[in-house]
Amino acid sequence: MVIGPKSAVFTTVRARGGSLFHLDLHLQRLARHAAVLGIEVPEISIPEGLEGLIRIQIDNGGVSFHSKEFYQEIHMDAEGITVPAPRWSRKIMGTKHGDWDAYRQITSEVLNKGADVAILIHDYCVIDGDRVMPLILDNDGVVWISDSKLGGVDSVTFDVCKGAIEDSGFIISEGRLNERLVARAKEIVLLGTGMGAARLTVLDDIDIGDGSDNLQKVCIEALGDDWR
């Protein structure tokens, strides 16, 4: 029996009234991550009437579906706490794998402290969020995302919004999201299945951004009316 990160692969989809948002993109990511982890993807048959946050998981028992009620306001102004990023081998990093309890524990601790999200740090840089992908807008109109080689999970929500962000005149660039970039950010948007397009307004009790929400508005419009 396989244990550890290669024991399972999963993705979490937003569902309302049996409609799973951007399911095709989620299944594509599931297949990519499964290939990295050495997990064979069987035929997936989606049950009817799913509602909430739906985790689709593949392990040695086959395909399973786990639902959780929506528990956070969509597109919120979020308060975050920095937390050291969990680390695995370079090959494992960036996948939604079977050793995810470290992330779940971080989420639980952050919510118990009254915050909304964890911002994950490694080597003095923002790598990812516990359930979101951070986008940092600087004063030159560049939207910075963490270099994929640093270990962040590729985001389906970002894939949905990317075209609209570029069409709005923003330049997307990968790099190291260091403390200086965060401190001088014009706006930080957090994209994720559960939070939609949230705006980070406080991090470790320090105000973030200049109060503008132009990038957030672009992302909210890209996600559409279903994200409510």
What positions do the PLM features span?
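Conserved alpha/beta cores of soluble small-molecule-handling proteins
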Residues: 1-123, 149, 158-228
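Glycine- and Gly-Pro-enriched alpha-helical subdomains that act as flexible
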Residues: 125-148
